[in-house]
A protein has these predicted regions:
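Short alpha-helical "recognition helix" segments of helix-turn-helix
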Residues: 93-111
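Short, Lys/Arg-enriched N-terminal segment that forms or immediately precedes the first helix
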Residues: 55-70
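Short Lys/Arg-enriched helix C-cap and helix-to-coil transition segments
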Residues: 126-149
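Short, amphipathic alpha-helical "recognition" segments used to contact nucleic acids or chromatin
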Residues: 73-98
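General nucleic-acid-binding
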Residues: 1-58
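Major-groove recognition helix of helix-turn-helix-like DNA-binding domains
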Residues: 110-126
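Extended, non-core accessory segments
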Residues: 11, 88-93, 121, 126-128
């Protein structure tokens, strides 16, 4: 991206102020990207680390309405909640913490196979959903940058 900006500047004929403005804009974009990455790392920090909290969270989850939800959907919803609270990075491709599958299996009262299958399929579906969201966001940001360059 930096090289693309640099190629469009004609250093021989451009006034110094235009070159400086472009370089400042590049530096500002890099600062924003670094800030966004830091915010994402903060968001990916687990909110819980003690597996004992899983039972309390599951009790609260079971007290919420699930009238029209099948047992499989209920399991998927709870596993997604557990991932968001204990290992949000797993939804973006990082590994699930050691022992989480065993504890989920114990709390849910289901087989390790069912829970591990759920743990492996949910992040993929979530990543695909987030990828679509990210593509839309990227398209919007790119369009804004082009409009800014054209002075619109």
């Amino acid at each position: 991206m930096k090289a693309d900006f640099m190629e469009r500047i004609d250093f021989a004929s451009a006034p110094v102020s235009a070159i400086e403005r472009r370089l400042l804009r590049i530096a500002d974009c890099e600062r924003r990207v670094a800030a966004a990455e830091a915010a994402l790392e903060h968001e990916l920090a687990p909110r819980y680390s003690d597996w004992a909290d899983l039972e309390r969270i599951y009790a609260a989850f079971c007290n919420s309405p699930h009238a029209d939800v099948t047992p499989v959907e209920r399991r998927e919803r709870f596993v997604l909640i557990a991932l968001l609270l204990f290992a949000p990075g797993a939804l973006l491709g990082r590994s699930v913490p050691r022992g989480m599958g065993r504890e989920l299996s114990r709390v849910l009262g289901e087989s390790k196979f069912a829970v591990s299958r759920c743990l492996s399929s949910l992040p993929l579906r979530y990543r695909l959903y987030m990828r679509r969201k990210a593509d839309l966001w990227l398209r919007d940001v790119t369009e804004r940058l082009h409009n800014e360059e054209r002075g619109l």
